[in-house]
Structures are given as C-alpha cells and as structure tokens.
Design a protein with these regions (language model features):
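Adenine-nucleotide phosphate-binding core of ATP-dependent small-molecule kinases
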Residues: 139-147, 176-206
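Glycine-rich phosphate-binding/hydrolytic loop that grips phosphoryl groups
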Residues: 6-17, 69-75, 193, 223, ...
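Gly/Thr-rich phosphate-binding beta-strand-loop-beta motif of the actin/hexokinase/Hsp70
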Residues: 16-49, 218
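Phosphate/ATP-binding catalytic cores across multiple sugar-kinase/actin-like superfamilies
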Residues: 7-18, 153, 157-160, 189-214, ...
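Phosphate-binding glycine-rich/basic clefts of nucleotide- and phosphate-handling proteins
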Residues: 40-173
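Alpha-helix capping and helix-loop boundary segments enriched in small/acidic/polar residues
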Residues: 21-27, 56-64, 178, 182, ...
C-alpha cells in the first residue's frame, strides 16, 4: 500500500503542465490543515511509481481555512456581542466565553460554552455588565446554539473581501440591526496569527528541503484568498505563484497517479 501526502497528490495535477523539471513548493491549505511539500516535478517524473526521491521537504499543521474564519469572527464580530466590555464595577469581562463561542473546531471549548453551568454564568454576566444588551446577544448565541452561523458569516465576509476593500456584515439571526463594516486592514489584523502559523509551515518545508523553489503551487479551499497570496509573495519575493483547481486538485492528482500505478 502506498500513502500519498495530499500536497504531493495536488502537485501531480500541476506537474502535467510543466515542460521541464522544476522545484515546486506545493502549499495545500484545507479547511482544518495546512500541508507544504517541496518537490522535484517535471516530465521525467510523470511515469515514476515511487515519488519518494522527488520529495525534498515537507511540513504540516492543524491550521486551515476554518481557523481563519474563527479568527475573523473573534476579532471582528465578537465585540458586537459585548467582548472587551466591563462590569458595572469597572472590572474587565473575561474573554474566554467569547472565544469558546466561536471555537467550532475545538470540542472541549464548545462543550464548555454550551454547558448548563456556562448558561448560568452568561446570565450572571448579562446582569453584571455595563453594556448588558450586547452581552445578552452572546447569551442568545448560547440559548439558540448559533456558533456555526456566526463563523459561517465570518467566512462569507472573508470571501467577500477577496474582491473589495470593505464589506458590511450583518447578523440578523442574532439581532435585526446587528452589523459592522470590515476593512481589508481589519481582515489582515484579524488573520495575522493563523496566517503566521501557515507561513511557518512554508518555511519549515523549505528548511527541510534546503533548496529554493522555482515556483509555488497554491491549492486548497483557502487558496483563493488574496491575503494568503500576498503573504506568500512577501515571504518568497520573486517566485511565481501558480494555482489550479482549488477544491479538486488532490483528487485530480490521485487520478493521474492511479493511471501510472494501474496502467
């Protein structure tokens, strides 16, 4: 049995477009993971069954598009629900309930947020907060289990900001007039931390490979984000960035490999 790393499979689809051997950095950013592989690719590798010798370096982590959406929801949407406020006595409200509310890829965090004990805590928080109306909206998220809808709204905002400088996001499922504007600058600030972790994986793959890529092949659901392309271009200036079928490249690559293995 041969197991293929997903960026290697994704890269095989891109390899079919090459007319000469190149060092290709494949960056595959999925929903929950980022995988990076530095590979030798080209016509001379097309019909090789064993690709181990073409793999120069690899790295990966459990950060992906979902983490970008969660970060945007936390930084840009949670303040609408009272995050960063104070009690009537001037004591800062704890941040954790707002984080747990949108940490949809963290089972313990979601279990804690939707626990009965946390419901009582949020009720007390509404009573004690200076801006009780805003904190009551977080309590509504708890009561109606709205976490996924909040993060989905953040994802839609991230997508909208791919081709415009500013986007107004509304959350009518929480409150009719609840809305805010998110700018490109706000998006960059919100996504800085998970984006940095993705760039660290790129650097790890390059450190493992000990060579500079000729081209970057960016794929996966988050590959369409101009912010990610910009960050990669800044990290690796002068290296062209190519793209393909962001959602189907792994499948297409595996199909090509199957033709080699079973022809």
């Amino acid at each position: 049995t041969t197991l293929f790393r997903s960026p290697v499979a994704a890269g095989l689809d891109f390899e079919a477009t090459l007319s000469e051997e190149k060092r290709v950095l494949v960056v595959d950013i999925g929903g929950g993971t980022t995988d990076c592989s530095l590979l030798l690719m080209g016509p001379q590798w097309h019909h090789r069954r064993d690709r181990e010798n073409s793999l120069l370096g690899h790295s990966g982590c459990r950060v992906g598009g979902n983490d970008l959406d969660i970060a945007l929801a936390f930084k840009s949407l949670m303040p609408l629900l009272g995050m960063g406020g104070q009690t009537e006595k001037g004591i800062a409200l704890p941040i954790l309930p707002w984080w747990n509310a949108i940490a949809i890829n963290d089972v313990p965090a979601q279990s804690d947020f939707y626990s009965t004990a946390n419901g009582r805590f949020l009720n007390d928080l509404v009573r004690d907060a200076q801006d009780a109306e805003k904190v009551a909206l977080l309590y509504k998220v708890w009561r109606q289990r709205l976490s996924y809808r909040v993060v989905r709204t953040a994802e839609e905002s991230k997508i909208a900001l791919s081709d415009r400088p500013e986007h107004t996001v509304s959350l009518p499922f929480i409150s009719d007039d609840l809305a805010t504007a998110i700018s490109q600058e706000g998006l960059e600030t919100a996504l800085a931390q998970p984006l940095q972790r993705i760039l660290e994986q790129v650097q790890l793959a390059l450190d493992n490979g000990k060579e500079k890529p000729d081209v970057i092949y960016l794929t996966g659901g988050s590959a369409r984000s101009p912010l990610i392309k910009k960050a990669l271009a800044e990290q690796l200036p002068g290296i062209p960035i190519a793209g393909g079928d962001d959602f189907g490249s792994v499948t297409a690559g595996l199909a090509r490999w199957a033709q080699v293995m079973f022809r």
